[in-house]
């Protein structure tokens, strides 16, 4: 099953995607809420590249930028496996040969370090899965990237019966104090408190009419059409209350109203990256159209062909929310078109840990989840299946296939199913 951050064939194809639980993941620098990565991250990356350069004998930083990191763990001398030896339990088992490096990828959200880095590995080896899953224990600090990599390298050395490399200890050296400001430290606490505070404000707003000045501030940046939608939702809620037909919960309704307002203000939304429609005016049932994907991807080309054939050049997702949102994730599935790859399961469910109870955080924003799914489809090499039977995508089948995958994960750890399984 896929972790929050996707990687493509050059990253995992049929291989494993295993990540660390974090908040609001915005792949490729997508919106994640909160301040963007600051000077600390730049200093961390610079330190990493200076220690684990491309000529390092054990661990190498292949590429690094503010939102993504690729690195390699070299297996020379691992487990005594000689050339041509059959892969053992501690050697890459899929898509590689003994001695190939372990390729590891990291995505960094805009909210780092309040949001931990999210890791993935190009392998379906459960031993590597365990290495990444243990990173969930490291959640706090301004140098999470360094802390995570120290744990990864140390655990990989143990896994492959290699001596601990002395350069790993260099990751403990402090960064210059002037680069990591108190503002960055305090922003982490502010981010963690934000959902509760904003929910309280939203709850008040639903009960009482805001003063004109306060309402103007709340509506700032939202277009007239979308303001009309918000007003209609409030009107329907009041009417349902009067009729004794209230659905959902105050907690979920308040948070979903906040999420919708934030989306309407978002530059990604206004820029046409995606669109949101409420199904039957229900705040708990969203249709999301992914209107733009990476133009260099095969998926983008497929969508252009789809437009010529069927007049639709978008991917339609459905988000279904329960009464206990935001403490449980939405159920997300692909409605159309039928896709292969991209970690899309039978029925259209999406195989990502962040969409499970274990990987979900109430601090996630819905926009960042949308952007993350878009990135996952592209990096997972999703392709449109032209001529496929559209009836194979349904809510019931998606729920069944996803439930089955979650049960397997709980017993055996995270893994990516074979391509033929979606």
From Swiss-Prot:
Residues 1-40, 173-221 are annotated as: Disordered. One of its GO terms (biological process) is fertilization. Residues 185-200 have a biased composition (Acidic residues). Autoubiquitinated in vitro in the presence of NEDD4L. It holds the Pfam family UQ_con. One of its GO terms (cellular component) is cytosol. Pathway: Protein modification; protein ubiquitination. Residues 1-24 have a biased composition (Low complexity). It is an enzyme of class 2 (transferase). The active site is at residue 351. Keywords: Acetylation, ATP-binding, Cell projection, Cytoplasm, Nucleotide-binding, Nucleus, Transferase, Ubl conjugation, Ubl conjugation pathway. Residues 251-415 form the UBC core domain. Expressed in liver, brain, heart, spleen, lung, kidney, muscle, ovary, epididymis, testis and placenta. Also expressed in thymus and ES cells. Only expressed in the uterus during pregnancy. Expressed in oocytes and during subsequent embryonic development stages (4-cell stage, blastocyst, 8.5 dpc, 13.5 dpc, 16.5 dpc and 18.5 dpc). It is found in: Nucleus; Cell projection, Filopodium; Cytoplasm, Cytosol. GO terms for molecular function: ATP binding; ubiquitin conjugating enzyme activity. Residues 25-35 have a biased composition (Gly residues). It comes from the Eukaryota. The modification N-acetylmethionine is found at residue 1. Disruption phenotype: No reproductive defects in males but females have reduced litter size due to embryo implantation failure, normal ovulation but a longer estrus cycle, reduced levels of serum prolactin at the beginning of lactation, abnormal sexual behavior and show reduced offspring care. Its EC number is 2.3.2.23. It catalyses: S-ubiquitinyl-[E1 ubiquitin-activating enzyme]-L-cysteine + [E2 ubiquitin-conjugating enzyme]-L-cysteine = [E1 ubiquitin-activating enzyme]-L-cysteine + S-ubiquitinyl-[E2 ubiquitin-conjugating enzyme]-L-cysteine. Monomer and homodimer. Only the homodimer is linked to ubiquitin through thiolester activation. Interacts (via N-terminus) with B4GALT1 (via N-terminal cytoplasmic domain); the interaction is direct. Belongs to the ubiquitin-conjugating enzyme family. Catalyzes the covalent attachment of ubiquitin to other proteins. Involved in female fertility and embryo implantation. May be involved in hormonal homeostasis in females. Involved in regulation of B4GALT1 cell surface expression, B4GALT1-mediated cell adhesion to laminin and embryoid body formation. This is Ubiquitin-conjugating enzyme E2 Q1. The lineage of its organism: Eukaryota, Metazoa, Chordata, Craniata, Vertebrata.
């Amino acid at each position: 099953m896929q972790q929050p951050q996707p990687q493509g064939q050059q990253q995992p194809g049929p291989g494993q995607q295993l990540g660390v639980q974090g908040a609001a993941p915005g792949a490729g620098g997508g919106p994640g809420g909160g301040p963007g990565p600051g000077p600390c991250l730049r200093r961390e990356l610079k330190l990493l590249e200076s220690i684990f350069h491309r000529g390092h004998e054990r661990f190498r930083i292949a590429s690094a930028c503010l939102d993504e990191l690729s690195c390699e763990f070299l297996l020379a001398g691992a487990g005594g496996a000689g050339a041509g030896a059959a892969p053992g339990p501690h050697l890459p088992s899929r898509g590689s040969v003994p001695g190939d490096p372990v390729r590891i990828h990291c995505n960094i959200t805009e909210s780092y370090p309040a949001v931990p880095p999210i890791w993935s590995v190009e392998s379906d080896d459960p031993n590597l899965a365990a290495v990444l899953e243990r990173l969930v224990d490291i959640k706090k600090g301004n140098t999470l990237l360094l802390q995570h990599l120290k744990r990864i390298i140390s655990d990989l050395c143990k896994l492959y019966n290699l001596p601990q490399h002395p350069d790993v200890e260099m990751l403990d050296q402090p960064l210059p104090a002037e680069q990591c400001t108190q503002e960055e430290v305090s922003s982490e606490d502010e981010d963690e408190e934000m959902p509760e505070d904003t929910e309280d404000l939203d709850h008040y707003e639903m009960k009482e009419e805001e003063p004109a000045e306060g309402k103007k501030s709340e509506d700032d940046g939202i277009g007239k059409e979308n303001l009309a939608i918000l007003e209609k939702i409030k009107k329907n809620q009041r009417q349902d209350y009067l009729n004794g037909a209230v659905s959902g919960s105050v907690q979920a309704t308040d948070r979903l109203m906040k999420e919708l307002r934030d989306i309407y203000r978002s530059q990604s939304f206004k820029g046409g990256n995606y669109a949101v429609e409420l199904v039957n005016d229900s705040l708990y049932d969203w249709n999301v159209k992914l209107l733009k994907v990476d133009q260099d991807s095969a998926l983008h080309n497929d969508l252009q062909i789809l437009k010529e054939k069927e007049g639709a050049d978008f991917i339609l997702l459905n988000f279904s929310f329960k009464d206990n949102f935001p403490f449980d994730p939405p159920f997300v599935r692909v409605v159309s078109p039928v896709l292969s790859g991209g970690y899309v399961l039978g029925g259209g469910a999406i195989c990502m840990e962040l969409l499970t109870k274990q990987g979900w955080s109430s601090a996630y924003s819905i926009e960042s989840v949308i952007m993350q799914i878009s990135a996952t489809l592209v990096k997972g090499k999703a392709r449109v299946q032209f001529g496929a039977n559209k009836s194979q995508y349904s809510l019931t089948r998606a729920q069944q296939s996803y439930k089955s995958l979650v049960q397997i994960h709980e017993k055996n750890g995270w893994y990516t199913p074979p391509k033929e399984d979606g």
